[in-house]
């Protein structure tokens, strides 16, 4: 594949073939699992190279046809010529169409019902048409009924689901529908600027189009007004419907590495047929590539016509990836009611569903999604591995994760991170332990992990010099009555003592108080384990003996006390080691297993203790800081960091602190739990500002803020914004959002906000009723018809009171400010708008049916006085 690739597309009726185009056009076949041929291979997808088409270079647009006998494409060129290619050596001149006037071909669309009919769109020419309907079996079109749009340009084109109506975006200002069933095709048009990317959903209920950063949804059966507009932060590059889902719309945005998905839902509330959507952004790149710079942007996407939620992606105009959407559970909240969106299902049953009947040792985890008819469908990934739903935790189906996240937000989860506060929240023990660990490690406005504290792999940096200190080692003496020839070497340094404290262990002189605290918290086995690690074996026996009196089943503690009190390592170490592996399976308490592993160790081999995952990472790290040499300690820290990244264990932040490894741990936890709330709040509370340049942190925070907005939790959102702003540099950036005049485009905000001196009523009214630059009238309030910026009570002779040295905008109550709907753009004074929507549901403008207040989750009848 030479040069950059501009686009790619699956063939609708050839599920294993796709075409890519750029300088040349190439045909590929996805390699089967048992195919080991080496004809050609792309870097990130196993394919066989089949053919290329060199006659048509630098294609402007390419469309794969619906022919079922052979792969055929239509190619549109910059000079307007359109060619039909079947990747054979034979040349047929009848398969080329050249318009009368030379200009660029802009769009192509095959008819799904009649595979020989092609719709062609060209750029504008004043004496020629821009839309051509070509039946390739009948040769070059000549009848006037096949040409439309004289003196116009075609921006995009598609077919309706009845396959007899052509829908075209024309001249950047309208959408036209041409019904070809009529002898002289009738035309229906609607004025709009969203004319790019026209496409009809698989169920035929929605028509989508876009311009810049706005996506518009239409009803193709009644296209008088849009159903909904979706605003994005970036301009769109491509939009497309997923063919295996009823209403899943995908969008690629310029200079973005994410795929944005909109799950469109219609809820018939009071016969209004309101449209809602659930937005989701996913990164198609493997986690190990997300921060490596290997991939930057997604340039093109092509959905597979049969495989469930499978797509081809073009990254950086060079790399082609075969991608399938990860399994997710959707539960959304509308502003009026809760909308449950369960496990997504395909539109139809695959032709050959896979079945698994392997032995227990060979069986791979599979799952199925039940359809309404009771049958089951198994979905497989392109590589052959099963579409695994069983990997989702069962709690996800039993608990409403959205409700849980929303409830935590209402309880100020993560706003004030302190241990007492987290004890009052409804958190899992895992999250409560994670936050407690982070609070313990966080000091001096930094989350310094044990890796930095111990000076591991820091080179010759200043942190390494601060962490370097003299390490003392001493041989510990076993207690009297316990004969053990193994030398137990303990390592001490200032950094290791600090690490022990960060792990929650007390200093030697405060050990008894620490053990008593654990005993008071009924952590008996952990207290006994720490005593044994400090060679206070008889103290551990006393703890377990006292604890056994308070237990319903004291047998395990009693047996442990007997074993410890009569332990003699030199006499029975071999016997204990032989029995330990089988006995550990019977001991359910991990702390007791660690006790026996420690006592029966061979020389300085502590692997059994360090690999006991039932013991918390902080306890294992404290043990490692006490008994491991420098080299072994560094290796163990590196192993645990990698294990935390692979498993998504937030406890690994104890080791990494605020670093790139810490961000990788958060990303891995996010991938496995979908808990964007915890990930965002950890980053906000404990990561320094320099790390906020990482796109992943920005994405987590933006996603969580979007959740708060969708729930109408404006005050919680504001509190979080204030907290985020407090950790940023104190230098305040200049204002970047202005009110601009519709006529001259200049800022009106300065005139509206900066009024340091009181003015007379007449002067102020005249000045505020028009643009200060072009003097054109400003918008009026929909209810009182006063101009924007005019105080509500000015017409009654009241003047706003101002105080010296106070800007004018601070003396205006919020209820007198101007607000407007983001959908219909109608507005007015906030006080008037609030009063109107307490009694009405539609926009106050008589010709507008927009339900403006439904965009907010707050009920009008419960609003408090905002003046």
Swiss-Prot record:
Q: Does the keyword Transcription regulation apply?
A: no
Q: Region Disordered: which residues?
A: 350-378
Where Zn(2+) 2 is bound, by residue? 784, 829, 832
Domain of life of the source: Eukaryota
Q: What does the tissue specificity note say?
A: Present in the oocyte.
Q: What else is known?
A: This protein rapidly evolved the ability to recruit the methyltransferase unmet at an evolutionary branch point between honeybees and mosquitos, corresponding to the emergence of the order Diptera. This allowed the GATOR2 complex to repurpose the substrate binding ability of unmet to function as a nutrient sensor for methionine.
What is stated as this protein's family in its record? Belongs to the WD repeat mio family.
- Cite the PANTHER family for this sequence: GATOR COMPLEX PROTEIN MIOS, WD40 DOMAIN-CONTAINING PROTEIN MIO FAMILY MEMBER
Oligomeric and partner information: Component of the GATOR complex consisting of mio, Nup44A/Seh1, Im11, Nplr3, Nplr2, Wdr24, Wdr59 and Sec13. Within the GATOR complex, probable component of the GATOR2 subcomplex which is likely composed of mio, Nup44A/Seh1, Wdr24, Wdr59 and Sec13. Interacts with Wdr24. Interacts with nucleoporin Nup44A/Seh1. The GATOR2 complex associates with unmet in the absence of S-adenosyl-L-methionine; the mio-Wdr24-Nup44A subcomplex is essential and sufficient for this interaction while Wdr59 and Sec13 are dispensable.
Q: How is this protein named in the record?
A: GATOR2 complex protein Mio
Q: Which gene encodes it?
A: mio
């Amino acid at each position: 594949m030479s040069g950059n690739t501009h686009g790619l597309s699956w063939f609708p009726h050839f599920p294993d073939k796709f075409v890519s185009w750029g300088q040349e056009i190439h045909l590929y076949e996805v390699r089967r699992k048992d195919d080991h041929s080496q004809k050609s291979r792309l870097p990130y997808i196993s394919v066989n190279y089949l053919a290329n088409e060199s006659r048509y270079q630098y294609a402007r647009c390419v469309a794969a046809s619906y022919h079922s006998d052979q792969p055929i494409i239509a190619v549109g060129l910059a000079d307007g010529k359109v060619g039909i290619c079947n990747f054979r050596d034979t040349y047929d001149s009848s398969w080329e169409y050249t318009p009368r006037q030379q200009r660029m071909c802009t769009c192509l669309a095959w008819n799904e019902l009649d595979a020989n009919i092609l719709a062609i769109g060209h750029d504008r020419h004043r004496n020629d048409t821009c839309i051509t309907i070509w039946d390739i079996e009948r040769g070059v079109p000549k009848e006037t009924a096949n040409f439309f749009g004289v003196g116009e340009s075609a921006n995009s084109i598609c077919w309706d689901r009845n396959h007899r109506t052509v829908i075209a975006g024309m001249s950047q200002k309208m959408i036209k529908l041409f019904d070809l069933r009529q002898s002289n095709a009738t035309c229906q048009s609607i004025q709009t600027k969203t004319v790019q990317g026209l496409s009809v959903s698989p169920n035929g209920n929605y028509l989508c189009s876009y311009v810049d950063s706005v996506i518009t949804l239409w009803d193709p059966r009644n296209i008088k007004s849009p159903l909904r507009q979706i605003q994005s932060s970036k301009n769109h590059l491509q939009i497309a419907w997923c063919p295996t889902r009823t209403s899943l719309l995908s969008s690629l945005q310029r200079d973005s590495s994410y795929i944005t998905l909109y799950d469109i839902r219609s809820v018939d509330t009071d016969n209004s047929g309101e449209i809602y959507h659930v937005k989701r952004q996913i990164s198609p790149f493997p986690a190990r590539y997300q921060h490596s710079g290997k991939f930057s942007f997604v340039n093109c996407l092509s959905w597979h016509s049969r495989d469930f939620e499978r797509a081809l992606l073009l990254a950086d105009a060079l790399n082609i990836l075969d991608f399938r959407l990860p399994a997710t559970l959707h539960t959304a909240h509308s502003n009026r009611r809760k909308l449950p969106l369960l496990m997504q299902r395909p539109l139809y049953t695959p032709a050959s569903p896979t079945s698994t009947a392997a032995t227990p040792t060979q069986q791979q985890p599979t799952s199925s999604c039940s359809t309404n008819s009771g049958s089951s469908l198994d979905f497989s990934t392109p590589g052959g591995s099963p579409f695994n739903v069983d990997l989702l935790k069962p709690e996800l189906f039993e608990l409403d994760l959205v409700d849980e996240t929303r409830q935590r937000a209402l309880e100020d989860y993560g706003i004030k991170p302190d241990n007492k506060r987290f004890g009052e929240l409804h958190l899992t023990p895992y999250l409560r332990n994670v936050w407690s660990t982070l609070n313990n490690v966080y000091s001096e406005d930094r989350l310094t992990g044990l890796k930095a504290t111990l000076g591991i792999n820091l080179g010759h940096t200043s942190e390494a010099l601060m962490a370097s200190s003299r390490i003392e080692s001493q041989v510990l003496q076993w207690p009297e009555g316990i004969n053990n020839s193994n030398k137990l070497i303990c390592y001490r340094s200032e950094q290791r003592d600090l690490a022990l404290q960060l792990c929650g262990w007390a200093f030697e002189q405060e050990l008894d108080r620490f053990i008593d605290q654990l005993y008071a918290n009924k952590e008996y086995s952990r207290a006994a384990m720490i005593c044994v690690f400090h060679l206070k074996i008889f103290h551990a026996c006393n703890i377990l003996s006292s604890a056994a009196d308070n237990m319903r089943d004291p047998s395990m503690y009693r047996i442990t006390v007997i074993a410890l009190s009569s332990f003699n390592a030199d006499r029975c170490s071999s016997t204990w080691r032989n029995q330990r592996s089988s006995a550990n399976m019977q001991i359910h308490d991990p702390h007791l297993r660690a006790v026996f592993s420690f006592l029966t160790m061979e020389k300085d081999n502590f692997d059994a203790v360090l690999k006991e995952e039932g013991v918390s990472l902080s306890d294992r790290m404290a043990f490692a800081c006490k008994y491991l040499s420098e080299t072994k300690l560094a290796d163990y820290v590196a192993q645990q960091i990698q294990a935390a990244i692979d498993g998504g264990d937030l406890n690994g932040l104890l080791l990494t602190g605020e670093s790139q490894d810490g961000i990788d741990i958060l990303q891995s936890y996010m991938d496995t739990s979908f808990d964007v709330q915890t990930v965002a709040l950890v980053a906000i509370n404990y990561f320094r500002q320099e790390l906020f340049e990482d796109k992943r942190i920005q994405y987590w925070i933006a996603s969580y803020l979007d959740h708060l907005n969708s729930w109408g939790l404006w005050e919680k959102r504001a509190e979080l914004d204030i907290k985020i702003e407090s950790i940023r540099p104190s230098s305040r950036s200049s204002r970047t959002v202005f009110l601009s005049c519709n006529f001259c485009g200049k800022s009106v905000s300065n005139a509206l906000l900066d009024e340091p001196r009181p003015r007379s009523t007449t002067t102020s009214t005249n000045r505020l009723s028009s643009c200060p630059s072009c003097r054109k009238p400003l918008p009026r309030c929909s209810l009182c018809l006063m101009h924007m910026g005019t105080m509500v009570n000015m017409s009654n002779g009241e003047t706003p009171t101002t105080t010296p040295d106070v800007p004018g905008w601070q003396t205006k109550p919020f209820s007198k400010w101007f607000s407007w709907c983001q959908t219909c753009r109608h507005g007015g004074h906030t006080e008037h708008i609030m009063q109107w929507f307490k009694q009405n549901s539609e926009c106050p403008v008589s010709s507008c049916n927009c339900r403006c207040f439904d965009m907010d989750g707050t009920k009008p009848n419960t609003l408090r006085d905002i003046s």
